[in-house]
Amino acid sequence: MDGLRQRFERFLEQRNLATEALGALEAKTGVDKRYLATGAATLLSLYLLFGYGAPLLCSLIGFAYPAYASIKAIESPSKEDDTVWLTYWVVYGLFGLAEFFSDLLLSWFPFYYAGKCAFLLFCMAPGPWNGAHMLYHRIIRPLFLKHHEAVDSIVSDISGRALDVAAGMTKDAGKVSVNQLQKAK
C-alpha cells in the first residue's frame, strides 16, 4: 500500500493539467490537494458504478488522456513514447472490437463500466506493469506474427478487387455522363 501512496504523492508533485487544477483548488479552498484528488477519484468511481452517463465517462477516460499523451509523444523526439501509445491504441482498438461483438452479453454485468474503466487505466498505466504492453507482448504480438502473412494476402486481394471495382465504376460513370450530355443537346 505504501508503494501506491508514494506513486500517488509523486504524481501530485508532477506538473501537468490535473495537478495545476488541483493546486489552484487547493489555493482557493485551503484543502490539501491530496484530499481533493482522493475525493475526485472517489466521486468518479462512484459515478462509474451508479451514474447515468457511465459509458460516456468511461469512454472519455479511455480516450482523452491517451489522445493527449499520444500527441505529445508524436511531437517529442523520442521513439519510445510513440511505441507506448501505439501499443495502447492497438489494445484499445481490439478491446473496442471485442466489446462491439459482445455488447449484449456485457450489458448484463453489473458495474461493467467501472471494470472497463479500471482495465483501460491498467492499459495506460506508466511503468513496467503497463497492461497494454503486457497484453501486446503476451497475446497480440504472438498471434500477429503467426498469422500476419495470411492477413496481408487477404488484404492485398481485397484492395486489388476494390481498385478494380472503383475503376469499373469510374468508367461506367464517365459513359453515363457522356450519354446524359449527348441527350441534353
UniProtKB/Swiss-Prot annotation:
Membrane topology: Multi-pass membrane protein
Keyword vocabulary terms for this entry: Cytoplasmic vesicle, Endoplasmic reticulum, Membrane, Transmembrane, Transmembrane helix
Single biological process term from Gene Ontology: detection of light stimulus involved in visual perception
Quaternary structure and interacting proteins, as annotated: Interacts with STX3. Interacts with clathrin.
A cellular component term, taken from the record's GO annotations: endoplasmic reticulum membrane
Similarity remark: Belongs to the DP1 family.
InterPro entries: TB2_DP1_HVA22
Pfam family for this entry, one: TB2_DP1_HVA22
Compartments reported by the entry: Endoplasmic reticulum membrane; Cytoplasmic vesicle, Clathrin-coated vesicle membrane
Its job: Required for correct function and survival of retinal photoreceptors. Required for retinal development. In rod photoreceptors, facilitates stability and/or trafficking of guanylate cyclases and is required to maintain endoplasmic reticulum and mitochondrial homeostasis. May play a role in clathrin-coated intracellular vesicle trafficking of proteins from the endoplasmic reticulum to the retinal rod plasma membrane.
Protein name per its UniProtKB record: Receptor expression-enhancing protein 6
Residues annotated as transmembrane: 43-63, 89-109
Tissue localization of expression: Expressed in the retina (at protein level).
